[in-house]
From Swiss-Prot:
Keyword Nucleus among record annotations: yes
Statement: the UniProt record of this protein carries the keyword Amino-acid biosynthesis: no
Domain SET intervals: 581-723
Biased composition (Polar residues): 197-207
Location of this chain's protein in the cell: Nucleus; Chromosome, Centromere
Domain spans labelled YDG: 310-448
Protein name per Swiss-Prot or TrEMBL: Histone-lysine N-methyltransferase, H3 lysine-9 specific SUVH8
GO terms for cellular component: chromosome, centromeric region; nucleus
Compositionally biased spans, kind Basic residues: 174-193, 212-231
Known function: Histone methyltransferase. Methylates 'Lys-9' of histone H3. H3 'Lys-9' methylation represents a specific tag for epigenetic transcriptional repression.
Length: 755
């Protein structure tokens, strides 16, 4: 046999194939090679793959993450195995191993020092002894070396791991089991653990050896790193939120705060809306509604705080609300977020809860079979089945208890949500259905109690009138348009008191704007005000109105002694725009003709101008029932916002009393508009506001605008205070009002006379 030069053959185990005996020394590989050539009939052995590697770095061949390993074989252990192999004629069967042909191998790099326990690489002198023993053996063991199947340059090898247990393969195999995904057979430097704050971890999460994936028990979003404490937000100097104000007088007693009346309810709603309008005028960037309602609650501007079943003192059937928080402020619906309000068991006085009020917002599958019935959808669900708890449980309990439930219906008007109080209902039935979302939902049937004034029914009536203009077939219809085309909207005339009476009002000429009897009503305004620099589209409204426009979204913000409006094309003018509401003249039961609206009217809305003929005292007739006189005595009331509710100085309070330098007299007896049909009331829902008007011709006039004092439901009579001529004092606090006519308004504040 021709001897061959020694060739370095290395047996490698894949880290995933199980425990390995480590790396065989070079001289031992030479002995095995020579014995293999001397054997004529080699014994059967599993095929092995032979690879030729140049300049191979053995350190890259071992993966320290492959699992437990004994590291490179110790010298004594390697010698014992070698001697036993030479003494055996038939070598024992061993699992298939990969045979690598290595040149220029550096044994010092043949193991990873971090792989675990190891006896260090085999000494070279010890390897010589093993080699000499192998050559001295007379019967060398038969080892079969399969032919070289695949020779691949090392640069194409890419250090792909190979699983010896996978069977024969002609190339690198797929990553074996147990090796971490993405690991490579390269030398790795030990990673230094990152510093982290032990205080930032949860002690219940268990021990951890370092930075890793969040384990069970660790708070969601928590990371093993130190965090800088968050700095508290600085107070916003422009914030209008009020927490407390010791000097503020809410003008509401503790008893009135627990249980109110109509005067208190009206006052609270007007005060809240005044704050909201002021925030709109200031262009307050934060939530205006939330700020206004929170300030009112914090400073005690609220009533009916006691939860109760049944009617709410001061709230009438048919009253409207433009914001959810308004219902909370007056105690109609105390739940600030849910559509079902209820009493707890301890509050109701019996076992179990009881529903007190429900609000239909239009977002759910509520149905109305008729104007006296409501099918109400329970709360909860989406994306799960509704359960019988909280509000649903309270409504279900009300079926058995038969207690009254207040119903507030939400409707859209001009893209705004309006809530109508529809009175008291009884919950008659409860069942479950599958809703549009595919989940179980509760349904409750509510029946309206008879004998109540109409609420929601009025809303649906005027909705049909506005949308379809069903005027002619109406009960008591007389005339389709009392303005005879002068107004942009028709003004119908109806008499529902006596359908047989088709008499129309006294003969008069309908006019849209003020008529002056050959005189200029000069109010002695400084002439320099007419030569001001243009600020807002060539008008001087801002400067004349103390630097702020009087309107926001066509709503009056504050009452003032005098409001200035430019003529011509000024975009802020209101008087010259004409009617924007669907008004109608109707016959009242005891006060002649009256005026009402098909539309809901928000507080501060311009209704119409009181038009007529401007006169002097000498020109006024004694029996003129259609005379407007600014010199009369009027009941004072507070309508503007309170500075304390907006973190403003109390001295910034705007005066509301009219202070005209000259008396304004307007007679609508012969010429006028719909304003002439507005009746007197000692507790009105409309107030008048003097407006200075410039016709751009050097003439300045004072005109009278009529604005809504509070939210007015549709088909509610519109009234304002006519005032009285004189007052006699009978004591320090007692006065006698001496008007020309007897008052029949019937309000709780009726003075007995007017005019």
């Amino acid at each position: 046999m021709v001897s061959t030069p020694p060739t370095l053959l290395m047996l490698f185990d894949d880290g995933d194939a199980g425990p390995s005996t480590g790396l065989v020394h070079r001289e031992k590989s030479d002995a095995v090679n020579e014995e293999a050539h001397a054997t004529s009939v080699p014994p059967h052995a599993p095929p092995q793959t032979l690879w030729l590697l140049d300049n191979f770095n053995i350190e890259d061949s071992y993966d320290r993450d492959a699992g437990p390993s004994t590291g490179p074989v110790h010298r004594e252990r390697s010698d014992a195995v070698n001697e036993e192999a030479h003494a055996t004629s038939i070598p024992p069967h061993a699992p298939p191993q990969t045979l690598w042909l290595l040149d220029n191998f550096n044994i010092e790099d043949s193991y990873d020092r971090d792989a675990g326990p190891s006896t260090s690489p085999i000494d070279r002198e010890a390897s010589h002894e093993v080699n000499e023993d192998a050559h001295a053996t007379s019967a060398p063991p038969h080892v079969m070396v399969s032919p070289l199947q695949n020779r691949r340059p090392f640069d194409q090898f890419n250090n792909q791991p190979y699983d010896a247990s996978a069977g024969p393969s002609t190339g690198p195999g797929k990553r074996g089991r147990g090796r971490p995904k993405g690991s490579k057979n390269g030398s790795r430097k030990p990673k230094k653990p990152k510093a982290y704050d032990n205080n930032s971890t949860d002690a219940s999460a268990g021990p951890s050896s370092g930075l890793g994936k969040r384990r069970c028990g660790r708070p969601k979003g928590l990371k093993n790193r130190s965090r800088k404490p968050k700095k508290p937000k600085a107070d916003d100097p422009n914030s209008k939120m009020v927490i407390s104000c010791p000097d503020f007088d809410s003008r509401i007693t503790e008893a009135e705060r627990e249980s109110g009346n109509q005067e208190i309810v009206d006052s609270i709603l007007m005060r809240f809306d005044a704050v909201r309008r002021r925030l709109c005028q200031l262009n307050y960037r934060k939530d205006k509604i939330l700020t206004a309602s929170t300030n009112c609650m914090n400073l005690g501007v609220r009533t009916n705080m006691t939860r109760r079943i049944g009617p709410i003192p001061g709230v009438q059937v048919g009253d409207i609300f433009y914001y959810w928080c308004e219902m909370c402020l007056v105690g109609l619906h105390r739940n600030t977020a849910g559509g079902i309000d209820s009493l707890l068991a301890k509050e109701s006085g019996v076992d179990g809860p009881a529903a007190t009020s429900v609000v239909t917002s239009g977002k759910y599958d509520n149905e109305t079979e008729d104007l006296e019935t409501l099918i109400y959808s329970g709360h909860g669900g989406k994306p799960c089945d509704q359960v019988l708890q909280r509000g649903n449980r309270a409504l279900e309990a009300s079926v058995r208890r038969r207690n009254e439930v207040r119903v507030i219906r939400g409707e859209l008007y001009n893209n705004e949500k309006v809530y109508i109080y529809d009175g008291l209902y009884l919950v008659s039935d409860c069942w479950q259905v599958t809703g549009k979302s595919g989940f179980k939902e509760y349904r409750f049937k509510l029946l309206r109690k008879p004998g109540q004034p109409p609420g929601y029914a009025i809303w649906k009536l005027v909705e049909n009138l506005r949308n379809h203009e069903l005027i002619d077939p109406r009960q008591g219809f007389i005339l389709g348009d009392l303005s005879f085309g002068e107004e942009g909207l028709r003004v119908p005339l109806v008499n529902e008191v006596d359908e047989e009476d088709k008499t129309i009002p006294d003969d008069f000429d309908y006019i849209r704007s003020q008529c002056y009897s050959g005189m200029t009503n000069d109010v002695n305004v400084d002439s320099q005000s007419l030569v001001q620099s243009y600020i807002h589209q060539n008008c001087t409204c801002i400067l004349k109105n103390c630097g702020q426009l009087p309107y926001h979204d066509n709503i009056l913000v504050c009452r003032k002694p005098l409001i200035y409006e430019c003529g011509g094309s000024c975009p802020t003018r209101m008087v010259e725009t004409g009617l924007k509401l669907h008004l109608e003249v109707f016959k009242t039961s005891n006060c002649g003709w009256g005026l009402r609206s098909w539309d809901p009217i928000r507080a501060g809305t311009f209704i119409c101008e009181f038009t007529g003929v401007s006169k002097t005292k000498e020109e006024v007739e004694e029996d003129d029932d259609y005379l407007f006189d600014t010199s009369r005595i009027y009941h004072s009331f507070r309508w503007n916002y309170e500075p304390e509710l907006l973190c403003e100085d109390a001295c910034e309070q705007v005066s509301e009393d009219a202070n005209l330098p000259t008396q304004v007299l307007i007679s609508a007896k012969e010429k006028g508009n719909v304003g002439r049909f507005m009746n007197h009331n000692c507790w009105p829902n409309v107030f008048w506001q003097p407006i200075e008007y410039d016709d751009n011709n050097g003439h300045i006039y004072v005109r009278i605008g009529l604005f809504a004092m509070k939210h007015i439901p549709p088909m509610t009579e519109l009234t304002y205070d006519y005032g009285i001529s004189c007052v006699e004092k009978t004591g320090e606090d007692e006065v006698i009002y001496k008007g020309k006519k007897i008052c029949l308004c019937g309000s709780v504040k009726c003075r007995g006379s007017f005019g």
